[in-house]
Structure formats: C-alpha cells, structure tokens
Amino acid sequence: MFDVLMYLFETYIHTEAELRVDQDKLEQDLTDAGFDREDIYNALLWLEKLADYQEGLAEPMQLASDPLSMRIYTPEECERLDASCRGFLLFLEQIQVLNLETREMVIERVLALDTAEFDLEDLKWVILMVLFNIPGCENAYQQMEELLFEVNEGMLH
C-alpha cells in the first residue's frame, strides 16, 4: 500500500501532473503499473481520509492545546513510530514545520498505513503528503521538502 502512495505522490502530485484524474482510469493505471488491487484500494481509501482533513470533514484528535505540553505516545504508536521517528516529529514541531494539529494528522495517517515495516524515511514522505494536502501549510510543506531533499542530496556527494 505504501508503495502505491509513493507512486501516486511522485507521479501525480509531486510532478504537478493533472490532479483531477478519473478514479477508474487511475485504478487501471496502477494495475498496469503492477500494483495489487487490494493495495490500490487501501491507498485510495488512505488518500480519501487525508482529503477529509483538507475539506474540513475530519479533524485530528486534539490531546492538548498547550504547545509546551509533551506528547506521550501510546504503545501502538510506539510500535509503528520508533524513537528516531518520534524524535523527528518533535524536531519538526520545534522548528515549526508541524504544529499540534498537523502532528496528530501525521500520526493518524501513519497508523492507518497497512505496512509491516515503517522507518524514518517513510515518515518523511507521509509528512510531505499530509502537508501538501492541508490548506495553509504551503510554507511548512516547502520547508519539509527542503529538509528531505537537502539530506538526500547530501548523501549522494
């Protein structure tokens, strides 16, 4: 499922391709690309839930409104988000790429992923997908994109 999301993000969203794609055509394109129908369905459902935030149909759980409060992760969240992922989320809050609300959106979308393995690089892409889809987060998206690509470019040299 995560592979389908990455493919969609890189092919349709990140490349600024036509964003209004017929769902049947999209499903066929993904099938032709070799993705499993169940993974396609789950990825599209995941994106649909993300779009609910964009349209104001869903709101992330608000655990605290005090920016100085500390987020305590549940055992399920700790299982999916290791210490490096949780530390990265805290770092993004401290540099104001994420706020309390967008952090909770990211965590909720991470937990909704149907994947056995999840690491820091995967988290970075989920953060990009969430920020891309939330109105008013354009600057945060740009900062996150710069963080992601600066680090990856630095690894190539």
Swiss-Prot record:
InterPro entries: Smg. It comes from the Bacteria. Belongs to the Smg family. NCBIfam families: PRK03430.1. PANTHER family: PROTEIN SMG. This is Protein Smg.
